[in-house]
Amino acid sequence: FMGSGFSESFSLPGESMKYGEFFYPGIVLMLLLFAAIFSTITLIEDRTAGFLQGVLVAPVSRLSIVAGKIMGGTAIALLQAIIFLAFAPLAGIALSLNSLFLLITLCVIIGLGFTGLGFMVAWFMDTVAGYHAVMSVFFIPLWLLSGALFPVEGAAEWLGWVMRFNPVTYAMEVLRMAFYARPSELIYNIQFLRALAVAGGWSLLTMTLSVLIVRWRSDV
Protein backbone atom coordinates (compact mmCIF):
# COMPACT_ATOMS: atom_id res chain seq x y z
CA PHE A 1 0.00 0.00 0.00
CA MET A 2 2.83 2.42 0.82
CA GLY A 3 4.53 1.54 -2.44
CA SER A 4 1.38 2.38 -4.38
CA GLY A 5 0.85 5.59 -2.45
CA PHE A 6 4.35 6.95 -2.98
CA SER A 7 4.94 5.51 -6.46
CA GLU A 8 4.41 8.81 -8.27
CA SER A 9 6.19 11.04 -5.73
CA PHE A 10 9.36 9.00 -5.20
CA SER A 11 12.38 8.80 -7.44
CA LEU A 12 16.07 8.00 -7.07
CA PRO A 13 18.65 10.07 -8.95
CA GLY A 14 19.39 8.30 -12.23
CA GLU A 15 17.00 5.44 -11.42
CA SER A 16 13.57 4.48 -12.77
CA MET A 17 12.73 2.43 -9.68
CA LYS A 18 9.27 2.90 -8.18
CA TYR A 19 8.76 3.20 -4.44
CA GLY A 20 7.17 -0.25 -4.21
CA GLU A 21 10.34 -1.80 -5.62
CA PHE A 22 12.53 0.29 -3.31
CA PHE A 23 10.43 -0.44 -0.21
CA TYR A 24 9.98 -4.19 -0.76
CA PRO A 25 13.40 -5.23 0.64
CA GLY A 26 12.67 -3.02 3.65
CA ILE A 27 9.55 -5.06 4.37
CA VAL A 28 11.62 -8.26 4.25
CA LEU A 29 14.02 -6.71 6.75
CA MET A 30 11.10 -5.70 8.97
CA LEU A 31 9.73 -9.26 8.90
CA LEU A 32 13.10 -10.58 10.04
CA LEU A 33 13.24 -8.00 12.83
CA PHE A 34 9.76 -8.63 14.21
CA ALA A 35 10.09 -12.41 13.99
CA ALA A 36 13.28 -12.12 16.05
CA ILE A 37 11.59 -9.83 18.57
CA PHE A 38 8.58 -12.04 19.15
CA SER A 39 10.57 -15.28 19.22
CA THR A 40 12.87 -13.97 21.97
CA ILE A 41 9.94 -12.72 24.05
CA THR A 42 9.39 -16.38 24.94
CA LEU A 43 12.65 -16.21 26.87
CA ILE A 44 10.96 -13.92 29.39
CA GLU A 45 7.91 -16.17 29.53
CA ASP A 46 10.14 -19.22 30.10
CA ARG A 47 11.79 -17.43 33.02
CA THR A 48 8.42 -16.47 34.54
CA ALA A 49 7.14 -20.05 34.24
CA GLY A 50 10.31 -21.47 35.79
CA PHE A 51 11.24 -23.43 32.68
CA LEU A 52 14.40 -21.43 32.00
CA GLN A 53 15.74 -22.08 35.50
CA GLY A 54 15.29 -25.80 34.92
CA VAL A 55 17.18 -25.64 31.65
CA LEU A 56 20.08 -23.75 33.25
CA VAL A 57 20.62 -26.41 35.92
CA ALA A 58 20.43 -29.24 33.37
CA PRO A 59 23.70 -30.84 32.18
CA VAL A 60 23.78 -28.91 28.89
CA SER A 61 26.22 -26.26 27.75
CA ARG A 62 25.32 -22.57 27.71
CA LEU A 63 26.25 -22.55 24.03
CA SER A 64 23.57 -25.16 23.29
CA ILE A 65 20.93 -23.12 25.10
CA VAL A 66 21.76 -19.94 23.21
CA ALA A 67 22.18 -21.70 19.85
CA GLY A 68 18.84 -23.48 20.17
CA LYS A 69 16.97 -20.28 20.96
CA ILE A 70 18.65 -18.19 18.29
CA MET A 71 18.37 -20.83 15.57
CA GLY A 72 14.72 -21.44 16.40
CA GLY A 73 13.93 -17.74 16.13
CA THR A 74 15.90 -17.46 12.90
CA ALA A 75 13.99 -20.41 11.40
CA ILE A 76 10.68 -18.67 12.10
CA ALA A 77 11.98 -15.42 10.60
CA LEU A 78 13.28 -17.24 7.53
CA LEU A 79 9.96 -18.99 6.92
CA GLN A 80 8.08 -15.69 7.01
CA ALA A 81 10.62 -14.07 4.69
CA ILE A 82 10.39 -16.92 2.15
CA ILE A 83 6.60 -16.66 2.06
CA PHE A 84 6.86 -12.91 1.48
CA LEU A 85 9.50 -13.34 -1.24
CA ALA A 86 6.96 -15.36 -3.22
CA PHE A 87 4.97 -12.14 -3.70
CA ALA A 88 7.92 -10.17 -5.13
CA PRO A 89 6.47 -10.17 -8.70
CA LEU A 90 3.53 -8.13 -7.40
CA ALA A 91 6.01 -5.34 -6.64
CA GLY A 92 7.51 -5.62 -10.11
CA ILE A 93 10.54 -7.62 -8.94
CA ALA A 94 11.58 -10.70 -10.94
CA LEU A 95 13.83 -13.07 -9.00
CA SER A 96 15.96 -15.80 -10.54
CA LEU A 97 16.69 -19.01 -8.65
CA ASN A 98 20.23 -17.80 -7.95
CA SER A 99 18.92 -14.51 -6.59
CA LEU A 100 16.38 -16.33 -4.45
CA PHE A 101 19.08 -18.61 -3.01
CA LEU A 102 21.28 -15.59 -2.24
CA LEU A 103 18.39 -13.77 -0.57
CA ILE A 104 17.57 -16.78 1.60
CA THR A 105 21.22 -17.01 2.66
CA LEU A 106 21.27 -13.31 3.53
CA CYS A 107 18.01 -13.66 5.46
CA VAL A 108 19.63 -16.38 7.58
CA ILE A 109 22.63 -14.17 8.36
CA ILE A 110 20.48 -11.15 9.19
CA GLY A 111 17.96 -13.24 11.13
CA LEU A 112 20.76 -14.61 13.31
CA GLY A 113 21.86 -11.06 14.06
CA PHE A 114 18.40 -9.82 14.97
CA THR A 115 17.61 -12.88 17.09
CA GLY A 116 20.96 -12.64 18.86
CA LEU A 117 20.27 -8.99 19.64
CA GLY A 118 16.77 -9.82 20.88
CA PHE A 119 18.18 -12.61 23.03
CA MET A 120 20.61 -10.24 24.74
CA VAL A 121 17.91 -7.71 25.54
CA ALA A 122 15.36 -10.33 26.66
CA TRP A 123 17.89 -11.94 29.01
CA PHE A 124 17.96 -8.76 31.12
CA MET A 125 14.20 -8.13 31.01
CA ASP A 126 11.93 -9.27 33.84
CA THR A 127 8.62 -8.50 32.13
CA VAL A 128 7.21 -8.59 28.62
CA ALA A 129 6.04 -4.99 29.10
CA GLY A 130 9.62 -3.90 29.68
CA TYR A 131 10.71 -5.71 26.54
CA HIS A 132 8.03 -3.94 24.52
CA ALA A 133 9.30 -0.61 25.82
CA VAL A 134 12.81 -1.44 24.62
CA MET A 135 11.35 -2.56 21.30
CA SER A 136 9.71 0.85 20.80
CA VAL A 137 12.76 2.97 21.63
CA PHE A 138 15.54 0.73 20.30
CA PHE A 139 14.51 -1.98 17.83
CA ILE A 140 12.09 0.07 15.70
CA PRO A 141 14.56 2.98 15.22
CA LEU A 142 17.15 0.45 14.03
CA TRP A 143 14.81 -0.39 11.16
CA LEU A 144 13.63 3.17 10.51
CA LEU A 145 17.23 4.38 10.24
CA SER A 146 18.43 1.51 8.05
CA GLY A 147 17.48 2.97 4.68
CA ALA A 148 14.34 0.86 4.47
CA LEU A 149 12.05 3.88 4.04
CA PHE A 150 14.37 6.31 2.27
CA PRO A 151 17.89 6.12 0.81
CA VAL A 152 20.85 7.11 2.96
CA GLU A 153 22.12 9.37 0.18
CA GLY A 154 18.98 11.51 0.29
CA ALA A 155 18.98 12.04 4.06
CA ALA A 156 20.23 15.13 5.88
CA GLU A 157 23.97 15.06 6.52
CA TRP A 158 23.67 14.45 10.28
CA LEU A 159 21.06 11.74 9.74
CA GLY A 160 23.19 10.11 7.08
CA TRP A 161 26.03 9.76 9.59
CA VAL A 162 23.68 8.19 12.12
CA MET A 163 22.45 5.72 9.50
CA ARG A 164 26.01 4.79 8.50
CA PHE A 165 26.81 3.87 12.10
CA ASN A 166 23.73 1.64 12.24
CA PRO A 167 24.75 -1.97 11.43
CA VAL A 168 21.23 -2.69 10.18
CA THR A 169 21.87 -0.20 7.37
CA TYR A 170 24.40 -2.63 5.91
CA ALA A 171 21.98 -5.53 6.29
CA MET A 172 19.46 -3.45 4.34
CA GLU A 173 22.09 -2.66 1.72
CA VAL A 174 23.00 -6.29 0.98
CA LEU A 175 19.33 -7.28 0.81
CA ARG A 176 18.48 -4.50 -1.62
CA MET A 177 21.47 -5.22 -3.84
CA ALA A 178 20.60 -8.93 -3.88
CA PHE A 179 17.11 -8.04 -5.11
CA TYR A 180 18.25 -5.96 -8.07
CA ALA A 181 21.68 -7.27 -9.14
CA ARG A 182 22.82 -10.62 -10.46
CA PRO A 183 24.63 -12.77 -7.88
CA SER A 184 27.51 -13.24 -10.34
CA GLU A 185 28.00 -9.46 -10.41
CA LEU A 186 27.88 -9.07 -6.64
CA ILE A 187 30.84 -11.42 -6.11
CA TYR A 188 33.12 -8.66 -7.40
CA ASN A 189 31.15 -5.70 -6.01
CA ILE A 190 33.23 -4.01 -3.28
CA GLN A 191 30.24 -2.16 -1.86
CA PHE A 192 28.27 -5.40 -1.50
CA LEU A 193 31.20 -7.30 0.01
CA ARG A 194 31.86 -4.50 2.51
CA ALA A 195 28.22 -4.37 3.58
CA LEU A 196 28.11 -8.18 3.80
CA ALA A 197 31.21 -8.17 6.02
CA VAL A 198 29.63 -5.62 8.38
CA ALA A 199 26.28 -7.46 8.49
CA GLY A 200 27.97 -10.83 9.02
CA GLY A 201 30.31 -9.44 11.66
CA TRP A 202 27.38 -7.84 13.48
CA SER A 203 25.48 -11.15 13.50
CA LEU A 204 28.52 -13.02 14.79
CA LEU A 205 29.03 -10.38 17.49
CA THR A 206 25.43 -10.56 18.78
CA MET A 207 25.57 -14.37 18.98
CA THR A 208 28.94 -14.34 20.74
CA LEU A 209 27.77 -11.73 23.24
CA SER A 210 24.61 -13.77 23.89
CA VAL A 211 26.71 -16.79 24.89
CA LEU A 212 28.98 -14.66 27.09
CA ILE A 213 26.00 -13.01 28.79
CA VAL A 214 24.39 -16.36 29.61
CA ARG A 215 27.67 -17.63 31.07
CA TRP A 216 28.15 -14.43 33.05
CA ARG A 217 24.60 -13.95 34.31
CA SER A 218 22.94 -17.28 34.97
CA ASP A 219 21.11 -16.16 38.12
CA VAL A 220 17.71 -15.84 36.49
Residue ranges and their predicted role:
Residues 1-17, 218-220:
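Hydrophobic alpha-helical transmembrane segments
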Residues 1-4, 86-91, 145-146, 176, ...:
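Residue-level signal for alpha-helical transmembrane segments in multi-pass membrane proteins
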Residues 1-4, 19-91, 118, 137:
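Hydrophobic alpha-helical transmembrane segments of multi-pass membrane transport proteins
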Residues 2-7, 122-169:
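Transmembrane helix segments
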Residues 11-14, 147-204:
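Membrane-interfacial helix-loop-helix junctions in multi-pass membrane proteins
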Residues 38-50, 115-122, 129, 153, ...:
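Short helix-terminus and kink motifs of transmembrane alpha helices
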Residues 49-57, 126, 136, 160-164, ...:
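Short amphipathic alpha-helical coupling elements at transmembrane boundaries
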Residues 62-136, 140, 186, 190-211:
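Alpha-helical transmembrane segments and their short interhelical loops
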